[in-house]
From Swiss-Prot:
This is Ribonuclease Y. GO terms for cellular component: plasma membrane. It comes from Syntrophobacter fumaroxidans (strain DSM 10017 / MPOB). NCBIfam families: HDIG (TIGR00277), RNase_Y (TIGR03319). Its EC number is 3.1.-.-. InterPro entries: HD/PDEase_dom, HD_domain, HDIG_dom, KH_dom, KH_dom_type_1, KH_dom_type_1_sf, Ribonuclease_Y, RNase_Y_N. The lineage of its organism: Bacteria, Pseudomonadati, Thermodesulfobacteriota, Syntrophobacteria, Syntrophobacterales. It is a single-pass membrane protein. The gene is rny. One of its GO terms (biological process) is mRNA catabolic process. Residues 210-270 form the KH domain. Belongs to the RNase Y family.
Length: 520
């Protein structure tokens, strides 16, 4: 019984505890709910206040913007009204001016109408006077024909011939005067530019010969070079493409060939074979192959070095190789690569003085003789070949034209072509730059004197200054002072058309009048 009572008490205590807990939880929940409702009301109140504030600010901003827009609109309206008023004033002024001009035009029309009537009357009178004048002229012409015994047509022809002769004389005098003035000015400026170019460029130069002789240590070496039954000499000629001539010349053999590069390969190969001592077909082919590679590399290096020295970049590799080949080519004993380098420097200096593209001038000068690298392989003038080459490898049109025109195969169309012509002549004409064979030199002198003697009125002609000047003495009775200018020009043009020569030739025509009287 006591045990049951204890359990009941425990259960009652538990139930009482649970009930008390439920009541306490209910109380806490209600309190928490009231707190949350209070927070919600506070948040709602704050939000309403903030919304009211934002609304007021927006209204104020809208009013302010409206006020500014209204003020801007009023200002623009005033400006537009003012512009319209000014425009209206200008229109009124123009209308007044137009009215005045209209009145002036009406007055002018009246005056012009009166003048037109007067002119018509004068025109009628002029026609009548012209008819009368023609009649008088016809009468006078008939009288003159009857008195002079010649017709009007014959008189016209005589007058025309007289006027033509007088015009020729005046034209010759005028040409002489203009040429004298132009030459004085041009010579002065050209001399300044050329002298400056020569002063600024002072390149060293040694005249080269087309050497094709290989020295031997002794006469026995000739037999070794020939080989058994001539097999060595045949191997050398087959490998190099050059003729090997062995004659009575002591301790020397001669290499003959049109291609200067092949001749250089043969010379170097033969010298190495002689130095090595082993001369047989297999060794010859081996040495020639090695020398070919070395010469090709040397050619490329020479072309690159020339372009670098001049300061020209971006040249096509094939043009560089052809440029290097010019090292083994000579013209009148002048090395063509050195000549091209010299022309490039002179072109650049003169271009700088004239204010044109200096780099383009140097490029044209360096490449102007590029055609000489292949003129022994292809037919045609080297200037034309060079122009075709540079066109093929993408050079600029002014460069191509300057190359084509540097020997006047085509007319020069720009200053660059003239510069290349001048620099080419300057490089080739300076003393010691070029040499020529005695036979060629003598024939050129004879041709100069022959050309001068082919013109009428020539008394004597002398080629002097090593063929760089042609001095001509004319008959004073057949050639007058005015004709001397035209004669010198005609002779110079004929020389240009018929002869080939380095540099330029000065043509001097001398006319002398002597009056002799004896005192008795």
């Amino acid at each position: 019984m006591g045990y049951v009572s204890g359990i009941l008490l425990v259960l009652i205590g538990l139930l009482a505890g649970v009930g008390l807990g439920v009541l306490l939880r209910q109380y806490w929940l209600e309190k928490r709910n009231r707190q949350l409702q209070e927070q919600a009301r506070n948040i709602l109140t704050d939000a309403r206040k903030e919304a009211e504030t934002i609304k007021k600010e927006a209204i104020l901003q809208a009013k302010d913007s409206l006020f500014q827009m209204k003020a801007e609109f009023e200002r623009e309206t005033k400006e537009s009204r003012k512009e319209f008023q000014n425009l209206e004033k200008r229109i009124l002024q123009k209308e007044e001016n137009l009215d005045k001009k209209s009145e002036a035009l009406d007055k002018r029309e009246g005056v012009i109408g009166k003048r037109e009537k007067v002119l018509q009357q004068q025109e009628k009178e002029l026609e009548e006077n012209t008819r009368e004048l023609h009649m008088l002229i016809e009468e006078q012409r008939k009288k003159l024909e009857s008195l002079s015994g010649i017709s009007a047509q014959q008189a016209k022809e005589m007058l025309a011939r007289a006027i033509e002769n007088e015009a020729r004389h005046d034209a010759a005098l005028m040409v002489k005067k203009i040429e004298t003035e132009a030459r004085e000015t041009a010579d002065r400026k050209a001399k300044n530019i050329i002298s400056l170019a020569i002063q600024r460029y002072a390149g060293d130069y040694v005249a080269e010969k087309t050497v094709s002789v290989v020295n031997l240590p002794n006469e026995e070496m000739k037999g070794r070079i020939i080989g058994r039954e001539g097999r060595n000499i045949r191997a050398i000629e087959a490998s190099t493409g050059v003729d090997l001539i062995i004659d009575d010349t002591p301790e020397a053999v001669i290499l003959s060939g049109f291609n200067p590069v092949r001749r250089e390969v043969a010379r170097v190969s033969l010298e190495r074979l002689i130095s090595d001592g082993r001369i047989h077909p297999a060794r010859i082919e081996e040495i020639v192959e090695k020398v070919n590679i070395e010469i090709e590399n040397a050619i490329k290096e020479s072309g690159e070095q020339a372009a670098f020295d001049v300061g020209v970049h971006g040249i096509h590799p094939e043009l560089i190789k052809l440029l290097g080949k010019l090292k083994y080519r000579t013209s009148y004993a002048q090395n063509v690569l050195q000549h091209s380098r010299e022309v490039a420097f002179l072109c650049g200096i003169m271009a700088a003085e004239l204010g044109i593209n200096e780099k383009q001038a140097k490029r044209a000068g360096l490449l102007h003789d590029i055609g000489k690298a292949i003129d022994h392989e292809m037919e045609g003038p080297h200037a034309t070949l060079g122009a075709d080459l540079t066109r093929r490898y993408g050079e600029a049109p002014p460069i191509i034209h300057a190359i084509a025109a540097h020997h006047e195969d085509v007319p020069a169309e720009d200053v660059l072509a003239i510069l290349v012509q001048a620099a080419d002549a300057l490089s080739g004409a300076r003393p010691g730059a070029r040499k020529e064979l005695l036979e060629t030199y003598v024939k050129r002198l004879e041709d100069l004197e022959r050309i001068a003697g082919s013109f009428p009125g020539i008394n004597k002609a002398y080629a002097i200054q090593a063929g760089r000047e042609l001095r001509i003495i004319v008959e004073s009775g057949q050639v007058n002072d005015a004709d001397v200018v035209l004669l010198s020009r005609d002779i110079a043009k004929k020389i240009e058309g018929e002869l080939t020569y380095p540099g330029q030739i000065k043509v001097t025509v001398i006319r002398e009048t002597r009056a002799v009287e004896y005192a008795k």
